[in-house]
Amino acid sequence: HLSSNDALEKVAEARDKGLPAYAETCPQYLFLSIDDDMNKPGFEDAKVVFTPPLREKWHQNKLWAGLKKNTLQIVSTDHCPFCFKEQKELGIGDFTKIPNGGPGIEHRMQLLFSGGFSEGRITLNRWIEICCTNPAKMFGLYPRKGTISIGSDADIVIWDPNKEYTISAHTHHMCTDYSMFEGKKIKGNAETVMSRGEVIVKDNKFFGKPGRGKFIKRDSYGTAWQ
């Protein structure tokens, strides 16, 4: 989970030498910072205790540039949720007892579309690459996953680029009582999600059934290394 320009420069240096160096970052490092999201009242700062920690805001533009230049290939989430009540609050009086991690899996694509493509930081194709194609290649799942092609699984998202909403713990579907991105206004959201040709999300409602997942045998190495 690359979070700083210092680490980004090391990755760029290795890639410039022709080494097979790959890296990813997470939405919290692209949208949150020490400057804007720390020093909150009470124990609120515990909501953004994770590893690596937040950095100064100036690192964000460097990370966006790394995504654009392909120094960074993927944006993941480091989704490791704990509720604020009764879990994060275990660290009141002792920082070392704060559970390390935060929720984020639900809003990865929306944040990157709204803050990346819509604001001109990355192209539409690049958004798809860092969210879908590159992860499939890295993990040895391409071309079964990560592309809409003959012979590939029909994993398809129909995207509404004009859908506007505000991220909130009151409306998200994650089983946690807070959001790291509470109050952030977003433009763009999934209208329909299909998995292997079956509609599992429609108009913000989930229709998937427990047990429908299938084992997928991966290649021994991803196509990114070839």
Predicted feature locations:
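Residue-level signal for inorganic ion chemistry
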Residues: E24, D78, L112, G197
